Every structure is written in structure tokens, then in C-alpha cells.
Amino acid sequence: MDVGVFIPIGNNGWLISENAPQYMPTFELNKAIVQKAEGYGFDFALSMIKLRGFGGKTEFWEHNLESFTLMAGLAAVTSKIQLFATAATLTLPPAIVARMASTIDSISGGRFGVNLVTGWQKPEYSQMGLWPGDEFFGTRYQYLGEYAQVLRDLWATGRSDFKGEHFQMEDCRVSPKPQADMKIICAGSSDAGMAFSAQYADYNFCFGKGVNTPTAFAPAAERLQAACAKTGRHVTSCVLFMVIADETDEAARAKWEHYKAGADEEAIAWLGEQGAADKGADSNIRQMADPTSAVNINMGTLVGSYANVARMLDEIATVPGMQGVMLTFDDFLEGVEAFGQKIQPLMQSRRHVTALKESA
């Protein structure tokens, strides 16, 4: 099973809590995280894009780096780990993204890919006059399909004459082409999102569900496989989980309860308000805004001893259609270190990594 890290490009990572570590995003922090992850054999690192945060006492996600420029910098200071940047497709024409991606492909030696997002938080785009209207909620995957086709054309052939409803290319050119096959990621979970991933993506990200229920996301992976049966393409799932681990279950649970007790209710309320704006929202967005465990945006959470977290991660690997897991941590530097030293060596699904380290 592949393992990746969802790096903290926004302040405070993924915990909306006054009791969680409070920090600003910097290149140096993310460099330290990704270099440490690479040293422990992580397969990939991905950064999101966020253009406006949730406010509240913690000013959650009000402070963010930009994804492509961050990953370009990280490409220059890493050598093995795969890197993915996120394109907010309402802000960047596909031909520009194709050229930026080709540039980072050159910097990284073929270790780069792109995560495509349509945009669900209206204020991110309306603040700069780029929101196309609320009808976009219903047409965004048609838009994204055209966007992805232009990217595929340019990366494969260096030119595009695509003519669609949203994009019209006229002998559009990008050179040099990427040296490696450029992977596309999406995180759709609605029927339209799954259909898009089955047609255009290489991997589809989904949210884990619940606390210490590692395989509860399996229906999402099953739905993706059903969508792929219609397109004849092989697309696999990667699932997002937060790891809160310690020497004992009790110590890990105490940290989790402490974070929940300090939840930034004002920021969480903003998240719920924005998530409700799209009446036909992807279940990812509805899940993020659910008040049940909104302190970490309702991503799946693994709370326990290092041994029990390793066991639960191995359970994830048994789900059909799984490619890998993408992890966040309450404290990223400590979390990646603990994963590499105390969790990964106990995982059967990572024996190929630990065996290499043992023989080195």
C-alpha cells in the first residue's frame, strides 16, 4: 500500500482547535516534513490550494501558501518522493497549468502530478471576481472534463485544438512535454465526480470515515470501481486519514479529546455555512461540514497506540481497489517521525519499505 502525506500548506494543518498546535505555513516547515517523509519511504506528498479560510479565533486557513510554487520548491530539494500540486481550475487556464506542470516535471525529474479541484467555497473565488455563478455547482464536472482533456492533449502531443463549451483551443502549444506520464488526481465522490475520475483521473481521493473505523470508506472505493467498469479504465482509490498516535491508546485518546474540547466553533460554523451553499454537494463536502467531528473536517481519524494504528492501516490495505492512504497528523514533524520509527515497521502492508531499510 502506498503512503503519502497531505502537507500543511495552510495554518494549523487540519485541526480546527484552539488546543491543537498553532503554526503558520512556511516553505521551511513543509521542506522539513517532506524530506523526513522521503527518508522514511513515503511514496508521495500532496498540497491543497486554499484561497480563503474559515476565520474564527484560530483564523483557520486564513494563511496559505500557493500549491504549485510550493511544490516546485520542494521538487528541487527532494529526489525520490512523488509530488502533487493542486490546481484551482477556476483561477488558472488549463494551458498555463500544463506548462507549469511540465516545468515542475523538469525540476523533479519526472516526479510530478496534478490534483484538479472545481471549487466549492464560493468566497474563495467571488473575492476576486472569478465565481461563475451558483449554477456552476451543477456543471462543474463538465467544466473539469474539458479542462482535463486539454491537459491530456497538451501533455501527450504538445498541442491542442480542443473545442468545447468552456474551452476553445486554437493550435495551442506546450513544449517541452513532460518526461514522465503526468498523473491526474481528483477527489470526487458524487456520481458526477466518480464519473469524471473514471474517465480522466489516475487516482481518486476519498475521505476516511469515523474514528477507528478504517474500512468504513469501502463503499466509496466500490463505487469508483463500478464507474471504471463503464469507462474501461483502471483508476484506484487513495483515502485520507488523520493519525493521532502515542505509546498507549489512553494517551492518544487524551490528545484527541483535548483537541475536540478546544474546537473553534466560529470557524466550524463558517465551514457548515459554506458546505450548505451547494444543495447538490458531493458527499465529501457534506462530510466535511458535518458537526459530528468537524474539529478535523470529519476526515477519517485513527486514534491509538502505535501498534493499533499500524493494525488499522493494514486493514485499510485490504479494501478492494485501494492504491494507498494519505495521512495528516496533529503535529506533522513528530507524526511523520513516529510513523517512520514506530508505526511503519509494524505494518505488513509496508514490509516492502521496511525490508529495504533493513537490508541497506
Curated annotation (Swiss-Prot):
<feature type="binding site">
    <location>
        <position position="115"/>
    </location>
    <ligand>
        <name>FMN</name>
    </ligand>
</feature>
<dbReference type="InterPro" id="IPR011251">
    <property type="entry name" value="Luciferase-like_dom"/>
</dbReference>
<comment type="function">
    <text>The FMN-N(5)-oxide reacts spontaneously with NADH to produce FMN. Requires the flavin reductase RutF to regenerate FMN in vivo.</text>
</comment>
<dbReference type="InterPro" id="IPR036661">
    <property type="entry name" value="Luciferase-like_sf"/>
</dbReference>
<dbReference type="InterPro" id="IPR050172">
    <property type="entry name" value="SsuD_RutA_monooxygenase"/>
</dbReference>
<protein>
    <recommendedName>
        <fullName>Pyrimidine monooxygenase RutA</fullName>
        <ecNumber>1.14.99.46</ecNumber>
    </recommendedName>
</protein>
<keyword id="KW-0560">Oxidoreductase</keyword>
<dbReference type="GO" id="GO:0008726">
    <property type="term" value="F:alkanesulfonate monooxygenase activity"/>
</dbReference>
<feature type="binding site">
    <location>
        <begin position="140"/>
        <end position="141"/>
    </location>
    <ligand>
        <name>FMN</name>
    </ligand>
</feature>
<feature type="binding site">
    <location>
        <begin position="49"/>
        <end position="50"/>
    </location>
    <ligand>
        <name>FMN</name>
    </ligand>
</feature>
<dbReference type="GO" id="GO:0052614">
    <property type="term" value="F:uracil oxygenase activity"/>
</dbReference>
<feature type="binding site">
    <location>
        <position position="190"/>
    </location>
    <ligand>
        <name>FMN</name>
    </ligand>
</feature>
<dbReference type="GO" id="GO:0006212">
    <property type="term" value="P:uracil catabolic process"/>
</dbReference>
<keyword id="KW-0503">Monooxygenase</keyword>
<dbReference type="InterPro" id="IPR019914">
    <property type="entry name" value="Pyrimidine_monooxygenase_RutA"/>
</dbReference>
<dbReference type="Pfam" id="PF00296">
    <property type="entry name" value="Bac_luciferase"/>
</dbReference>
<dbReference type="GO" id="GO:0019740">
    <property type="term" value="P:nitrogen utilization"/>
</dbReference>
<dbReference type="GO" id="GO:0046306">
    <property type="term" value="P:alkanesulfonate catabolic process"/>
</dbReference>
<feature type="binding site">
    <location>
        <position position="124"/>
    </location>
    <ligand>
        <name>FMN</name>
    </ligand>
</feature>
<keyword id="KW-0285">Flavoprotein</keyword>
<comment type="similarity">
    <text>Belongs to the NtaA/SnaA/DszA monooxygenase family. RutA subfamily.</text>
</comment>
<keyword id="KW-0521">NADP</keyword>
<keyword id="KW-0288">FMN</keyword>
